[in-house]
Regions:
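Internal nucleotide-binding/catalytic subdomain
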Residues: 1-134
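Active-site "cap" helix and flanking loop/linker of ATP-utilizing ligase/carboxylase catalytic domains
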Residues: 85-107, 125-195
Length: 195
C-alpha cells in the first residue's frame, strides 16, 4: 500500500496476532512468470509470460488471480533469461536435486524484473500458474505428454522438445462480483467471439 496509515495499522495488527512481523523490500519493476518443468536430471524452461491481475481496465480495481496473460513476455529478454537461469533456476535445481526426495514437476517462478534487467523472486509455486499456463502451453511445438512423462520418469534431460516462435494471449471472463463475492451458476455470455 502507499497509504502510511494503512501500513501502520497492518503492522500493529500483525504484532498483536503473534508478535512477529516480516518486512520486505518493495520491489519496483515489471513482473514475469516462468514455468520450469524439472526433475533430478535437468529442467526445461518454458517461454516466460506476463499476467495482469487487476480486475478493471487501466490497471484499476482489486487484485485477482489474473484477468489475462500473454507470452512471450517482452520484458524477459535473452539477457534477463540468462540471469534468471544462472542466479535463480540453476541454484534452485541444484538445491532440489540434493534433497532426500528429488523434485519432479513444475516450478512456477514469479519474478520482478527491475529497470536494470535484474530478476528478483517474488514467489515460487510447485504447480502450473493460471492464467499463465493458458498462454505458455500452446507455444510448446513438441508433444507435451512426452515432456511430462519424461519428467515423471526422471529423464527430462533426454527429452527432445521445441518451442514455437508464435505469441499467445488469453482473456479471462469472470462472473459478477469476482474476486470477492462471485456469483456462481450463471452463464457467461459473449464467448462466441472468433479471431
Amino acid at each position: 500500500t502507499s497509504d502510511r496509515n494503512e501500513a501502520f495499522n497492518a503492522l500493529c495488527n500483525g504484532i498483536e496476532l503473534d508478535g512477529k512481523v516480516l518486512l520486505e523490500e518493495f520491489l519496483f519493476g515489471e513482473e514475469a512468470s516462468v514455468l520450469v518443468v524439472m526433475d533430478e536430471s535437468g529442467y526445461v524452461c518454458l517461454p516466460a509470460s506476463q499476467d495482469h491481475k487487476r480486475l478493471l481496465d487501466g490497471d484499476n480495481g482489486p487484485n485477482t488471480g489474473g484477468m489475462g496473460a500473454y507470452a512471450p513476455a517482452p520484458i524477459y529478454t535473452p539477457a534477463v533469461e540468462q540471469r534468471t537461469i544462472s542466479e535463480i533456476i540453476e541454484p534452485m535445481h541444484h538445491f532440489l536435486r540434493n534433497q532426500d526426495v528429488p523434485y519432479r514437476g513444475c516450478l512456477y517462478v514469479g519474478l520482478m524484473i527491475d529497470e536494470n534487467g535484474a530478476p528478483f523472486v517474488v514467489e515460487f509455486n510447485v504447480r502450473f500458474g493460471d492464467p499463465e499456463t493458458q498462454v505458455t502451453l500452446p507455444l510448446i511445438s513438441s508433444d507435451l505428454g512426452e515432456l511430462l512423462m519424461s519428467c515423471a520418469n526422471g529423464k527430462i534431460s533426454e527429452c527432445d522438445y521445441s518451442i514455437s516462435s508464435y505469441s499467445s494471449a488469453t482473456i479471462v471472463l469472470s462472473s459478477e462480483g469476482y474476486p470477492s463475492n462471485s456469483i456462481t451458476g450463471r452463464v457467461i455470455n459473449g464467448t462466441e467471439i472468433r479471431i
